[in-house]
């Protein structure tokens, strides 16, 4: 409407206003929701849980799983409620004994220097926190006051023990150690020993080792059974291998973990075109081991979607020997280079080995035959002008 009146030029009219409502509208395919995020968090929302009381049966685990603000709020309210509760008890004891009556009393009070609820509240804090100012004290006049003193001390010790244990468990949780276990941002598929392999790189930034480290991998995809049952998250275990074979790894330096795509692999019919079309595929990698310093089992997780798998790439070397020891350049941790790789599935490669022979023949031509050019006649491929240096 504004463009018709000449207020907004015609070329600045929004596309949404200019499109024909009778024409069908197309939109890009939405990206598949992750089952496990890149940082290892499970992308699952639990809804309509009826038996909420099950969480209260394990109060300690519930407190540890809560976020820090909620945990601190619960402990703060626990201290305040216990102080107020016992302050009311001390005030009632003083009121029943007549210690709150005005005037100089000839009888010995149950608790000295308690004249109001405020003084009873201060005495409750002094008893539970064991401050010991010395202005108020329990006398031998009331046995009930002695019993309440013992009960409040026990309650205070229990709250302190639970709070310290919860804080210790939250600060020493296993996932804190997993923050320094890193995975490559992309996974690659390339030839290794004449077979197509799915490869990724894993590393540990700390010097303290992960003992008995093992790595597992699962493929998660949406499948339909022959009976018509739709399984939205069908999980299939696939074997992972390293340089020494098996799932156990010695994670001192970054390692390239690979999976040989053979006839038993769920990636046997996966080709480069499937990756480009964002196939409904997610590969979850789980690294698990025991922390050397604490003895706690830790687990690091990540996942790779179809568009995060690079076909025909290989990781660059990052470990070098310098001054009698090995050094790791983490700036190249996720860097890859293109390598000759058949543009077919592992199934097609097993059926037609000529694809691999043709690829090997093509890769041996050209780069190995290097023309020798005399140094004196060699021409520079580029030159640096004085303007470029300024």
Swiss-Prot record:
This is ATP-sensitive inward rectifier potassium channel 11. The modification Phosphoserine is found at residue 385. KATP channels are regulated by cytoplasmic ATP/ADP ratios; ATP inhibits the channel by closing the pore, while ADP activates the channel. Activated by phosphatidylinositol 4,5-biphosphate (PtdIns(4,5)P2). GO terms for cellular component: cytoplasm; inward rectifying potassium channel; T-tubule. Homotetramer; the homotetramer binds four ATP molecules (one ATP per subunit). Forms an heterooctamer with ABCC8/SUR1; one KCNJ11 homotetramer interacts with four ABCC8/SUR1 molecules. Interacts with ABCC9/SUR2. It comes from the Eukaryota. Keywords: ATP-binding, Disulfide bond, Ion channel, Ion transport, Membrane, Metal-binding, Nucleotide-binding, Phosphoprotein, Potassium, Potassium transport, Transmembrane, Transmembrane helix, Transport, Voltage-gated channel. Residues 1-65, 172-390 are cytoplasmic. PANTHER family: ATP-SENSITIVE INWARD RECTIFIER POTASSIUM CHANNEL 11, INWARD RECTIFIER POTASSIUM CHANNEL.
